[in-house]
Amino acid sequence: MAKLKITLVKSLIGRKKEHIATANALGLRKIRATVEHEGTPQIKGMLKKIDYLLKVEEI
C-alpha cells in the first residue's frame, strides 16, 4: 500500500462534530498539520469523509 501525506488546509472551526473527530483521529489538529499514513481502506474512508478540508499526496 502506498504511503499518503495528509495536510489539513482548512480550519475545523464550525464543522460538524463528526468531521472534527475524524480529523483528530487522523492526527490533524491545526491548520497546515501534516501526517503520514498507509493507504488502507479505513484511512481512505476517513479521507473521503473530510476531503474538502485536506490536501492528500502519495509518497
UniProtKB/Swiss-Prot annotation:
GO biological process, one term: translation
A UniProt-annotated Pfam family: Ribosomal_L30
One Gene Ontology CC term in the entry: cytosolic large ribosomal subunit
Quaternary structure (record): Part of the 50S ribosomal subunit.
Native organism: Clostridium botulinum (strain Eklund 17B / Type B)
Keyword Ribosomal protein found: yes
Gene Ontology molecular function, alphabetical: structural constituent of ribosome
Residues annotated as transmembrane: none
Ribosomal protein in keyword set: yes
Protein name: Large ribosomal subunit protein uL30
Family: Belongs to the universal ribosomal protein uL30 family.
Record key words, sorted: Ribonucleoprotein, Ribosomal protein
